[in-house]
Amino acid sequence: MKAVHFGAGNIGRGFVGLLLHEAGYEVVFADVADALISQLASASSYDVHEVGENPAVKTVSGFRAFNSASQEAAVVEEISTADVLTTAVGPHILKFVAPVIARGLAVRPADLPPLQVMACENAINATDLLHTEIRAAWDDSAGDLDAVAVFANTAVDRIVPNQAPGQGLDVTVETFYEWVIDRTPFGGNAPKIPGATFVDELGPYIERKLFTVNTGHASAAYFGYAAGLEKISDAMADPAVAAKVRAVLEETKELLVAKHGFEEAEQEAYVQKILSRFTNPHLPDTVNRVGRAPLRKLSRHERFVGPAAELAERGVTPAALLEAMSAALRFDDGNDDEAVELTNLLSELDAAAAVERITELTPTHPLFPALQKLVEDRQAEA
């Protein structure tokens, strides 16, 4: 069995690539980072260090690696005969890898079963987006795209912090992980990945992860940044910050239980597990790394506005989520492009226009007045 994986970074090596290797796949990494690909191509193995409860070191070997820009022909050939294709490149990069994937699918031998494609990105329905981008790049003379590939959405969860200098290809990750895959597109032929969980309805799991893990992690980052703390574990060790994060997750728990029918005790246990992960002192994750890209994190269907808007539509005032968004508006890390852009927007636009631009909500939405007040308060500080 062979799996082509786009994105040879820390998540690709320390999460998706590891699970594919453990499932028995020969992993072929594709990336445009030339130095990284050169390292992988010349290495026989790398280690994944799992830290936290039950720490372990796992070795990944038997992989190959290609530069998908300068060695495109080789990547196309690998895709044409692969069993599985995965990505961990970031949702905004999918449009750049789609043409290469389309070319690989176009020359896939007719006697092979459809390639099983799964985008493992920190975004809702990322595989649907990849499918759309591949279709846009598809040459209709090659036949029916859906005859040569099957696309399944996934939800992925593993904290992979910035790595210490000098680690080389080795990756440090938390022990916890979750890879949930929609089994329905595969019919009865789902890929054999023992480390993954296959479900018939993925939507509730995607939202549970996004509105608990991502919302909580970003909340800890922004509250921690406001408190002058450096690491996420430092932030969660601060009683005031921890209480604010807990309050945020109480609100998202209320929404998830009401909307998706999760048992309250089950969701509470999930929240407790997530909070314990954030306190892991072995993960040197910084508030600056987790808080980066605040504009994306404050967008309409993301981790803050998404649940807050739904709660407001249900007649609930999401006070804790609003406090987290207020902290996000104050994330002014000069090394982060989106933080700089956010600061500029807040100085250039009036409050109502800024809310519309940042959150994509209309002034008639029930959450809009509260967000406008947050922005007005932030602008008054400037």
Curated annotation (Swiss-Prot):
UniProt entry tagged with the keyword Oxidoreductase: yes
GO molecular function: mannitol-1-phosphate 5-dehydrogenase activity
E.C. designation(s): 1.1.1.17
UniProt GO cellular component terms: cytosol
InterPro entries per record: 6-PGluconate_DH-like_C_sf (IPR008927), 6PGD_dom2 (IPR013328), Mannitol_1_phos_5_DH (IPR023028), Mannitol_DH (IPR000669), Mannitol_DH_C (IPR013118), Mannitol_DH_N (IPR013131), NAD(P)-bd_dom_sf (IPR036291)
Pfam families per the UniProt record, alphabetical: Mannitol_dh, Mannitol_dh_C
Keywords from the UniProt entry: NAD, Oxidoreductase
Segments forming a coiled coil: none
UniProt-listed GO biological process terms: mannitol catabolic process
Reaction(s) this enzyme catalyzes, per UniProt: D-mannitol 1-phosphate + NAD(+) = beta-D-fructose 6-phosphate + NADH + H(+)
Residue sites binding NAD(+) per the record: A3, V4, H5, F6, G7, A8, G9, N10, I11, G12, R13, G14
UniProt record similarity statement: Belongs to the mannitol dehydrogenase family.
Name recorded for this polypeptide: Mannitol-1-phosphate 5-dehydrogenase
Species this protein is from: Paenarthrobacter aurescens (strain TC1)
Source lineage: Bacteria, Bacillati, Actinomycetota, Actinomycetes, Micrococcales
Originating gene: mtlD
